[in-house]
Regions:
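Function-determining surface determinants
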Residues: 1-291
Length: 291
């Protein structure tokens, strides 16, 4: 059974971080090796584990220097091989929710085509051999990581950097908005959430309530991103059985929903990113002294 994604307070920081990184890669390897009947659930588990692994790898960046990008890209490429079916499913779910809220006569045709595209994506089994090969590389990379003597300080620096960049993205989202800005912000939020989970309850800025709010913010931004994917897909809809009008209706509803989600995300962001970075770091001081 996989270990909890959490550092043991009695475990040295360095050993714990390395253990967790290797554990998440092992979870991903096991998840992509499941029988075909369990593939969808396995891919979901693998993608989540790889996201957590990439967050943990951030802590080791100062130790591995220029090789960080290669190691990160190995994890990212493995996840990318598993993304097609997930994105197709997300578009179907988003379109169905929009039509449930404000039905349109021709929406069923559009949703039906999206559903068939999702079925095709699932039928095209991902190259699990390639994914497994990438994960073996990632596993060897993780095993080679040194046990940093100042791992607590490195962890605080990594969490502080994800906060700093997330705060900049939040301010940019409030001022400009836009799909790319929100997508970048979501990535920073996820990194902060993952790193905070490792030390949940051990500082004021990694309390259970804040970790829960970060999870909620990530979900809001994730739903916004799924709608952005849907809007792009709807823009390519051919006029089959009069579906162009329905596709346009769904796209308009998606844009309206995206704006609402972005507003809610920015409001929650004000609570989670209101502190200046130096004040945030001060609240992590106790962790920096851990071995």
């Amino acid at each position: 059974m996989p270990m909890p994604f959490r550092l043991d307070p009695h475990e040295p920081f360095a050993a714990g971080l390395k253990r967790i990184l290797m554990g998440e890669i092992a979870v991903a390897r096991a998840a992509v090796a499941v029988p075909r009947a369990e593939q969808a659930a396995g891919i979901h588990r693998a993608r989540r584990a790889l996201k957590r692994a990439r967050s943990v790898l951030l802590v080791f960046r100062p130790l591995i220097g220029e090789d960080y990008r290669r190691r990160r890209d190995v994890l990212r490429d493995a996840a990318d091989h598993l993304s097609a079916a997930r994105d197709a499913d997300a578009m179907v779910a988003s379109a169905q929710k929009l039509d449930d809220r404000r039905p349109h006569d021709g929406a069923g045709v559009v949703i039906g085509r999206l559903s068939r595209a999702a079925e095709i994506a699932h039928a095209q089994r991902p190259d699990t051999g390639r994914v497994a090969a990438l994960l073996r590389i990632a596993e060897a990379d993780a095993a080679s990581l040194p046990l940093a003597p100042a791992a607590g300080r490195l962890f605080v620096e990594a969490l502080g950097e994800t906060y700093r960049r997330g705060r900049a993205d939040w301010r940019k989202a409030e001022e400009e908005g836009g799909e790319d800005v929100l997508h970048d912000w979501r990535k920073r939020v996820k990194h902060r959430w993952h790193l905070s989970l490792l030390v949940v309850g051990r500082t004021a800025v990694t309390s259970r309530s804040i970790v829960g709010d970060l999870d909620e913010l990530g979900e809001l931004l994730g739903d916004e991103h799924d709608l952005a994917l849907l809007v792009r897909r709807l823009g390519k809809e051919a006029d089959v059985s009069g579906s162009k009008k329905a596709a346009r209706h769904l796209a308009e509803e998606a844009e309206r929903r995206r704006r609402k989600l972005a507003r809610r995300a920015c409001e929650l962001g004000a609570e989670l990113y209101g502190d200046k970075t130096r004040h945030f770091l001060q609240k992590l001081d106790g962790l920096a002294t851990d071995a």
